[in-house]
Design a protein with these regions (language model features):
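Hydrophobic packing and interface segments
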Residues: 3-165
């Protein structure tokens, strides 16, 4: 391999350490957006009451979904570990399922908070403010998925040095 090729590989290896940092930055941005959303007015008492029912329903849905998901994930984890004889691959799957679940949970928490605040902003401040709150709420889920995805994939690679997992 030429000197330039070795230098290129070295640079790529160093850049790989930036990926988890970018993932963490994405999660910090999601946290910032969440704080911004929570500062918005949640509307009048009736709006807050309806929002609490929506939040309660969303929580019930997530818990029912996660009960089924846990069974699937455990069974598939075992199938991967046994069939592929690669517990590292199975562990990477498990970590991905966990990170995905955390993303879904965070997204649902923020979505239920953003919904009532979007309605309140539309009522009190107009469409521009309502859209800002709504887009911020949706962005939290996207940033959580992206941030945790980058963090998970990069950590698996940095620990194993195996892109084939």
């Amino acid at each position: 391999m030429s000197a330039q090729g070795k230098e290129g590989n070295y640079i790529m290896e160093q850049l790989l350490y930036l990926v988890p940092v970018i993932g963490i930055l994405g999660l910090l941005f999601a946290f910032f957006l969440t704080c911004t959303i929570k500062k918005q007015q949640a509307g009048n008492d009736r709006m807050k009451e309806i929002a609490s029912y929506i939040h309660e329903g969303a929580q019930a849905f997530l818990m029912a979904e996660y009960r089924i998901l846990v069974i699937f994930v455990v069974v598939f984890f075992l199938i991967l570990g046994i069939a592929l004889k690669s517990w590292m691959t199975a562990a990477a799957f498990l970590m991905g399922a966990l990170f995905s679940s955390v993303s879904g949970y965070c997204g649902m928490q923020v979505a239920t908070k953003a919904n009532v605040r979007t309605a309140g902003a539309a009522k009190d401040s107009g469409m521009k403010q309502a859209l800002s709150v709504a887009f911020s709420g949706g962005s939290v889920m996207g940033m959580c998925v992206t941030g945790l995805g980058l963090l998970g994939i990069s950590l698996v690679y940095l620990v194993t040095k195996d892109a084939g997992i």
